[in-house]
Protein backbone atom coordinates (compact mmCIF):
# COMPACT_ATOMS: atom_id res chain seq x y z
CA UNK A 1 0.00 0.00 0.00
CA UNK A 2 1.33 3.42 -0.95
CA UNK A 3 1.15 6.38 1.35
CA UNK A 4 2.61 9.69 0.21
CA UNK A 5 4.52 7.92 -2.57
CA UNK A 6 6.27 5.54 -0.17
CA UNK A 7 5.77 1.87 0.53
CA UNK A 8 4.52 1.39 4.06
CA UNK A 9 4.24 -2.39 3.86
CA UNK A 10 7.89 -3.44 4.17
CA UNK A 11 9.36 -4.89 7.30
CA UNK A 12 13.09 -4.36 7.85
CA UNK A 13 14.85 -7.05 9.84
CA UNK A 14 18.23 -8.77 10.04
CA UNK A 15 18.90 -11.32 7.30
CA UNK A 16 18.31 -14.86 8.55
CA UNK A 17 19.77 -18.18 7.39
CA UNK A 18 16.48 -18.94 5.62
CA UNK A 19 16.99 -15.79 3.48
CA UNK A 20 20.31 -16.94 2.04
CA UNK A 21 19.04 -18.22 -1.34
CA UNK A 22 16.79 -15.20 -1.88
CA UNK A 23 19.61 -12.87 -0.81
CA UNK A 24 22.05 -14.52 -3.23
CA UNK A 25 19.55 -14.25 -6.10
CA UNK A 26 18.77 -10.62 -5.21
CA UNK A 27 22.45 -9.62 -5.18
CA UNK A 28 23.05 -11.55 -8.42
CA UNK A 29 20.25 -9.56 -10.12
CA UNK A 30 22.06 -6.40 -9.03
CA UNK A 31 25.49 -7.72 -10.11
CA UNK A 32 26.72 -7.46 -6.51
CA UNK A 33 27.79 -10.95 -5.47
CA UNK A 34 31.30 -9.57 -5.31
CA UNK A 35 32.61 -6.05 -5.51
CA UNK A 36 35.75 -4.03 -5.27
CA UNK A 37 36.26 -0.96 -3.14
CA UNK A 38 39.31 0.76 -1.71
CA UNK A 39 41.60 -1.78 -3.36
CA UNK A 40 39.89 -4.79 -1.81
CA UNK A 41 37.64 -7.49 -3.24
CA UNK A 42 34.51 -7.92 -1.10
CA UNK A 43 31.78 -10.55 -0.95
CA UNK A 44 28.62 -8.96 0.50
CA UNK A 45 27.05 -12.29 1.49
CA UNK A 46 29.94 -12.81 3.92
CA UNK A 47 28.78 -9.78 5.93
CA UNK A 48 25.74 -8.95 8.07
CA UNK A 49 22.67 -7.64 6.27
CA UNK A 50 19.29 -6.09 6.81
CA UNK A 51 16.47 -7.11 4.50
CA UNK A 52 13.26 -5.32 3.62
CA UNK A 53 10.47 -7.84 3.17
CA UNK A 54 7.23 -6.88 1.42
CA UNK A 55 3.81 -7.87 2.74
CA UNK A 56 3.75 -10.87 0.38
CA UNK A 57 7.03 -12.18 1.80
CA UNK A 58 9.24 -11.27 -1.18
CA UNK A 59 12.57 -9.52 -0.73
CA UNK A 60 12.06 -5.83 -1.52
CA UNK A 61 15.55 -4.62 -0.59
CA UNK A 62 18.77 -5.50 1.15
CA UNK A 63 21.60 -3.57 2.81
CA UNK A 64 24.87 -5.30 3.70
CA UNK A 65 27.21 -3.68 6.19
CA UNK A 66 30.60 -4.09 7.83
CA UNK A 67 30.83 -3.02 11.46
CA UNK A 68 34.30 -1.86 12.43
CA UNK A 69 36.16 -2.98 15.55
CA UNK A 70 34.00 -2.31 18.61
CA UNK A 71 31.46 -0.64 16.30
CA UNK A 72 33.53 2.57 16.16
CA UNK A 73 32.32 2.86 12.58
CA UNK A 74 30.03 0.98 10.24
CA UNK A 75 30.38 0.76 6.47
CA UNK A 76 27.38 0.27 4.22
CA UNK A 77 28.73 -2.23 1.73
CA UNK A 78 25.71 -2.62 -0.58
CA UNK A 79 22.23 -1.17 -0.77
CA UNK A 80 19.79 -2.43 -3.39
CA UNK A 81 16.03 -2.25 -3.69
CA UNK A 82 13.58 -3.91 -6.05
CA UNK A 83 11.71 -0.70 -6.87
CA UNK A 84 13.32 2.70 -6.45
CA UNK A 85 11.59 5.84 -5.21
CA UNK A 86 9.27 4.02 -2.78
CA UNK A 87 11.08 4.48 0.54
CA UNK A 88 12.59 1.01 0.88
CA UNK A 89 16.17 2.28 0.64
CA UNK A 90 15.45 4.99 3.20
CA UNK A 91 13.91 2.42 5.55
CA UNK A 92 17.06 0.28 5.28
CA UNK A 93 19.37 3.29 5.87
CA UNK A 94 17.38 4.35 8.91
CA UNK A 95 17.41 0.79 10.28
CA UNK A 96 21.19 0.42 9.97
CA UNK A 97 21.55 3.88 11.53
CA UNK A 98 19.48 2.80 14.55
CA UNK A 99 21.50 -0.40 14.86
CA UNK A 100 24.78 1.53 14.69
CA UNK A 101 23.59 4.10 17.27
CA UNK A 102 22.62 1.32 19.70
CA UNK A 103 26.16 -0.04 19.36
CA UNK A 104 27.71 3.36 20.07
CA UNK A 105 28.95 3.81 16.51
CA UNK A 106 30.26 7.26 15.65
CA UNK A 107 30.50 6.99 11.86
CA UNK A 108 28.24 5.47 9.21
CA UNK A 109 29.89 5.54 5.80
CA UNK A 110 29.56 4.30 2.25
CA UNK A 111 31.65 4.18 -0.92
CA UNK A 112 30.04 4.68 -4.31
CA UNK A 113 31.42 5.24 -7.78
CA UNK A 114 31.58 8.52 -9.65
CA UNK A 115 28.95 7.39 -12.18
CA UNK A 116 26.34 6.52 -9.53
CA UNK A 117 24.41 9.75 -9.84
CA UNK A 118 21.37 8.19 -8.18
CA UNK A 119 23.43 7.37 -5.05
CA UNK A 120 24.96 10.85 -5.06
CA UNK A 121 21.41 12.18 -4.94
CA UNK A 122 20.11 9.62 -2.44
CA UNK A 123 22.73 9.68 0.32
CA UNK A 124 23.07 13.47 0.84
CA UNK A 125 19.30 13.73 1.17
CA UNK A 126 19.62 11.29 4.08
CA UNK A 127 22.28 13.30 5.91
CA UNK A 128 25.45 11.93 4.31
CA UNK A 129 28.27 14.33 3.38
CA UNK A 130 30.93 13.79 0.77
CA UNK A 131 34.21 13.40 2.64
CA UNK A 132 36.69 11.97 0.15
CA UNK A 133 37.24 11.22 -3.52
CA UNK A 134 39.54 8.29 -4.18
CA UNK A 135 40.77 9.34 -7.62
CA UNK A 136 41.53 6.45 -9.96
CA UNK A 137 40.40 3.82 -7.43
CA UNK A 138 38.04 2.12 -9.89
CA UNK A 139 40.76 2.09 -12.56
CA UNK A 140 43.13 0.38 -10.11
CA UNK A 141 40.48 -2.17 -9.08
CA UNK A 142 39.73 -2.92 -12.73
CA UNK A 143 43.44 -3.47 -13.42
CA UNK A 144 44.21 -5.67 -10.42
CA UNK A 145 41.06 -7.11 -8.82
CA UNK A 146 38.01 -7.15 -11.03
CA UNK A 147 38.71 -6.77 -14.76
CA UNK A 148 35.01 -7.01 -15.62
CA UNK A 149 34.36 -3.53 -14.20
CA UNK A 150 33.25 -1.51 -17.23
CA UNK A 151 35.11 1.62 -18.30
CA UNK A 152 31.85 3.50 -18.84
CA UNK A 153 29.16 3.41 -16.20
CA UNK A 154 25.65 4.74 -15.69
CA UNK A 155 24.52 7.65 -17.84
CA UNK A 156 27.57 7.20 -20.10
CA UNK A 157 29.91 8.55 -17.40
CA UNK A 158 33.51 7.25 -17.48
CA UNK A 159 33.92 4.98 -14.44
CA UNK A 160 37.14 5.99 -12.62
CA UNK A 161 36.76 7.13 -9.03
CA UNK A 162 35.28 6.05 -5.70
CA UNK A 163 33.44 8.61 -3.62
CA UNK A 164 33.20 8.28 0.16
CA UNK A 165 30.24 9.71 2.06
CA UNK A 166 29.53 9.62 5.79
CA UNK A 167 27.14 10.73 8.50
CA UNK A 168 26.67 10.19 12.18
CA UNK A 169 24.32 7.29 12.77
What annotation goes with each model-predicted range?
Residues 14-84, 90-94, 103, 168:
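Acetyl-CoA-dependent GNAT
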Residues 34, 40, 44-45, 64, ...:
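Conserved acyl-donor/pantetheine-binding loop and adjacent beta-alpha core of acyl/acetyltransferases
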Residues 110-120, 131, 135-142:
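Conserved beta-strand-loop-alpha-helix junction that forms the acyl-donor binding cleft
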Amino acid sequence: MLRGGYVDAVKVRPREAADQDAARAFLARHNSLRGARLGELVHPLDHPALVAVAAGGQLAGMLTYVPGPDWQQCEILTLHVGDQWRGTGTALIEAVGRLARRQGCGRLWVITTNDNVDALRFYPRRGFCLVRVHRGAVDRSRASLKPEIPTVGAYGIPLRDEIELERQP
